[in-house]
Amino acid sequence: MRKLFIATLGFEEKFVIRSLIRSGLSRGDSIIIFAPKGYTEDDKSLRAAETIKEIVSRILPDINMRIEEYDLQGDFAEEIFRIRNVIQSYQFDEIIACLSGGMRALILGVISILLTLNGYPITIEVEFENLERYVRIPLNVLKIPYNSRWVTVLEYLASGKSVRAISKDTRLSPATISRIISEMRLYRLVDEDNKLTEEGYFYVKMYKKVFQKKET
């Protein structure tokens, strides 16, 4: 799968570099670093950008990298349209977005753009300031509506139960369970073997308590 790695530029390069290494990029993948328009006039931002370019050229020589200036002073919606076209000009199967650095307005702009994109997995990664840990969120899952039946079936699948066993426990027909699984597969919550994906586990954890409260 071809990856498009995007990141927001701040005063330090360490967050971008650490995320790049974790992402496991290889030949055929691409990198876009979004920087505020006029970033070259700021010594810290320019130094961070130059360091990123130098390290990428050394450890990922076969990967195309681009620094795209983001106009934070212009029309917000028009800039979303422009940057979305920049992203869609690339060929990729998934997006990894490192949003650990940069101005809040820049991060908001990039998140807004990512929310308008459909058709491929998008993972947002944010690292703690002390570098002790990082958070990864499958953005697509946040756009999937809550469905109590989906939560139930996902929990059964996570425990290793078959369609027939789930049908027996829930008193829903095997055909209904299979249809629910097919629906969830369209949202990448389960794979072809009816195993939960990363998105599926995230969905269950995010809505499990909501489901339990509604049941009680």
Describe each model-derived feature in a short phrase:
Residues M1-E94, L108-I111, L115-T216:
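Long, low-complexity, Lys/Arg-enriched
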